[in-house]
Curated annotation (Swiss-Prot):
Keyword Methyltransferase: yes
Role summary: RNA N6-methyltransferase that mediates N6-methylation of adenine of U6 small nuclear RNA (U6 snRNA).
Similarity comment: Belongs to the methyltransferase superfamily. METTL16/RlmF family.
UniProt keywords, alphabetically: Cytoplasm, Methyltransferase, Nucleus, S-adenosyl-L-methionine, Transferase
EC numbers for this chain: 2.1.1.346
Protein name: U6 small nuclear RNA (adenine-(43)-N(6))-methyltransferase
Organism: Schizosaccharomyces pombe (strain 972 / ATCC 24843)
C-alpha cells in the first residue's frame, strides 16, 4: 500500500496521534521513504525508532570523524552498531547518507531476521552485515578478517529493573512505547551497558571513536566519572534536542586528534562540571595589534624555536617539545640543544575579523596546549605595552 495512503489513515485533524502505534510506525516509514529513499518494515512487536534523532546521531558521528581525520585519511569507514534492532535503522541511514559500511549486532533472533530483510529490500547487503550474538558474548565482536571498525555507536537499553520499564510503558511521557523487554532493560541500565563498552574499548584502541546515546541526563555524570577514572581525557558530550525530546551522546577516543568544541561541549551549562577541556582559545585584538599580528606571531614562534608552516591564512604549529616556558629557556641556555621537555602537540592559529584563534588539533596532554596558549597570551600583552 502506498505510504501516502497509510499517512492519511494515521492523521486526524491534521495531527499525528503519537499514542497510536500504527501512526508512529507509518510516520517512520514515510520519513525514511521521502527523505532517504529507504523502504523499512517496523514489526508490531518491536521498538519503532524516531527517525529524526537517529539521523541526527549519524550526522554527529560524521562531523566527529570529519573533525578528527587528516586529509590523508581516505580509508573505508566501517561502523559498528551494537544492538541494531529489527529496523536496522543506523546502518541503513549511515549507508544512505554517507556510504559507510556497517556491522550490526543483535541478540534477538526475530530482530536479527527482520534486520536482514530490511537490508535486502534496500539492496545494501554488500555494505551491511548483521551478526547474531548472545548475552554472554562481549559487546565488541571480532572484525573477522575485515579492517578494524572506525567507530562504535549504541543506544543502550534505558532501564535497569523490569518494574521501571513496566511503569514507563504504562505512563510514557509523550507517546506510546513500542519497545519490548530486551530492548529496554539491561543489567545496570544504560550506564552499566556503556561501562561494559568502555571496559572492552581499552583492548581495542585502534577504533577511532566510541559513542553512546543516552536517554537519561543523570547517566552523563556517571559515565564521565568512569572515563576520568580511567584517565581518558579525549572525550566529549553532545546534547540532542528535537522537539520535547532530549538525548545525550558521549564519545571517547584513545587517539590524539581533538574534535571541535561544539561537538564535545554543549551550549547548555547544566553539565558544565563534566565538560572536557576547551580546544579553542580566542583573543580579541585591537586595531593596532591586528595590523601587526602576522609579524608578532612569527617572531613569537621563531624566538621560541617552535616549528610552524603557513597554509593560506592559517599558521600550523607542530611541536615535539616545550620550548616556550621559562623552565625550557633555562635548560636551553645550559645546553647546546633545544629543550628536551616533552610537549608533542599540534594546533592552528588563525585571525578571523579581530579575533585570534588557537585551535588544539592533536595531542594527549592538555597542559601542553594550555602552556602554549599562556605563552602566546603573554606575547600579545607584551606587544600592547
Amino acid at each position: 500500500m502506498p505510504i501516502y495512503i497509510l499517512i492519511e489513515r494515521s492523521v486526524k485533524n491534521g495531527r499525528i496521534d503519537f499514542w497510536n502505534e500504527d501512526a508512529i510506525r507509518t510516520l517512520g516509514k514515510a520519513i525514511l521513504d521521502r527523505d532517504y529513499s529507504l523502504r523499512v518494515e517496523f514489526p508490531e512487536n518491536r521498538l519503532c525508532p524516531m527517525v529524526p534523532n537517529r539521523a541526527t546521531y549519524i550526522r554527529y558521528i560524521h562531523d566527529l570523524l570529519s573533525s578528527t581525520s587528516g586529509q590523508k585519511d581516505k580509508k573505508r569507514i566501517i561502523g559498528l552498531d551494537i544492538g541494531t534492532g529489527a529496523s536496522c535503522i543506523y546502518p541503513l541511514l549511515g549507508c544512505r547518507m554517507y556510504s559507510y559500511d556497517f556491522v550490526g549486532t543483535e541478540i534477538d533472533k526475530f530482530s536479527f531476521e527482520t534486520a536482514k530483510s530490511n537490508i535486502l529490500q534496500n539492496n545494501m547487503e554488500s555494505q551491511i552485515k548483521i551478526v547474531l550474538r548472545s548475552k554472554q558474548d562481549c559487546l565488541l565482536p571480532d572484525t573477522e578478517g575485515m579492517e578494524e571498525f572506525t567507530f562504535v555507536m549504541c543506544n543502550p537499553p534505558f532501564y535497569e529493573h523490569e518494574e521501571d520499564f513496566i511503569n514507563f510503558k504504562q505512563n510514557p511521557p509523550s507517546g506510546v512505547c513500542t519497545g519490548v523487554y530486551h530492548e529496554m532493560v539491561t543489567e545496570g541500565g544504560e550506564v552499566g551497558f556503556a561501562n561494559k563498552i568502555l571496559t572492552e574499548s581499552k583492548k581495542r584502541k585502534g577504533i577511532q571513536w566510541y559513542t553512546c546515546m543516552f536517554g537519561k541526563k543523570s547517566s552523563v555524570p556517571a559515565v564521565v566519572d568512569k572515563l576520568r577514572e580511567q584517565n581518558i581525557s579525549n572525550y566529549g558530550i553532545y546534547e540532542l534536542a528535537l522537539g520535547k525530546t532530549k538525548r545525550w551522546i558521549i564519545c571517547w577516543s584513545f587517539q590524539a586528534m581533538r574534535p571541535h568544541n561544539e561537538l564535545i561541549r554543549p551550549s547548555s551549562t547544566s553539565l558544565s562540571k563534566y565538560f572536557p577541556h576547551k580546544v579553542l582559545q580566542n583573543w580579541t585584538l585591537d586595531p593596532e595589534l591586528c595590523a601587526q599580528i602576522d609579524d608578532i606571531l612569527q617572531k613569537f614562534l621563531d624566538d621560541n624555536k617552535i616549528p610552524w608552516s603557513k597554509k593560506g591564512s592559517v599558521l600550523e604549529i607542530s611541536t615535539k617539545s616545550i620550548t616556550w616556558s621559562r623552565k625550557a629557556r633555562r635548560i636551553s641556555k645550559s645546553q647546546t640543544s633545544v629543550s628536551s621537555l616533552e610537549g608533542q602537540m599540534k594546533c592552528e592559529l588563525n585571525v578571523i575579523d579581530n579575533q585570534l584563534q588557537c585551535k588544539w588539533i592533536e595531542g594527549y596532554d592538555y597542559n601542553v596546549y594550555e602552556s602554549f596558549c599562556s605563552a602566546l597570551a603573554r606575547a600579545l600583552r607584551d606587544n600592547k605595552k
